[in-house]
Design a protein with these regions (language model features):
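Bacterial Sec-dependent N-terminal signal peptides
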Residues: 1-23
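Alpha-helix N-cap/start motif
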Residues: 97-98
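N-terminal presequence-like segments and the immediate start of the first folded domain
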Residues: 15-85, 89-94, 109-155
């Protein structure tokens, strides 16, 4: 009887170990890096976006014209509009679009400009397809910008 119980416990333990090993099997994940010619020319130390498992991670963008290190004039609304155009340009180059964005993070130099930024930002998304979003104030944004936005999208 003891031998039967030991045999059953051994069999049960063997099954659990096999299942655990299968659960932790990992596959190598490929990372694609996208850097536009404009970003290469400016010698920025980052990619415009990385793609992992069909998810596009767009690096923080500011309201500069492509190939230029100065943000557009006109304040938070104009900077936000140009920032969103920069994000859209990257997504389109990667075969995606703004309607596939599911998460954004907005960093503002001055949080009191949140409403003005949001007014321009929401123009880039269908009302029923606005991504989840976080926004906070930070100092020292890239290129002296008032706004920097990063996004995640499906390819």
């Amino acid at each position: 009887m003891k031998k039967n119980i030991i045999a059953i416990l051994f069999l049960f333990t063997s099954c659990v170990s096999t299942k655990t090993q299968n659960t932790y099997t990992t596959l190598e994940t490929e990372i694609d890096y996208y850097t536009s010619d404009n970003t290469k020319e400016l010698d920025f130390p980052f990619s415009d976006a990385t793609i992992v498992n069909n998810v596009i991670y767009v690096a923080g963008q500011v309201g500069n014209l492509p190939g230029n290190t100065k943000v557009v004039p006109g304040g938070i609304k104009e900077e936000t509009k140009q920032t969103m155009k920069n994000i859209e340009r990257i997504l389109v180059a990667l075969g995606s679009s703004m309607d596939k964005v599911f998460k954004c993070t907005c960093m503002l130099l001055d949080i009191s400009e949140w409403a003005e930024m949001s007014e321009e930002y929401k123009k880039f998304f269908a009302e029923d397809k606005r991504p989840s979003r976080s926004a906070f104030a930070g100092s020292g944004l890239a290129l002296g910008a008032k706004i920097e936005i990063e996004c995640w999208a499906i390819r």
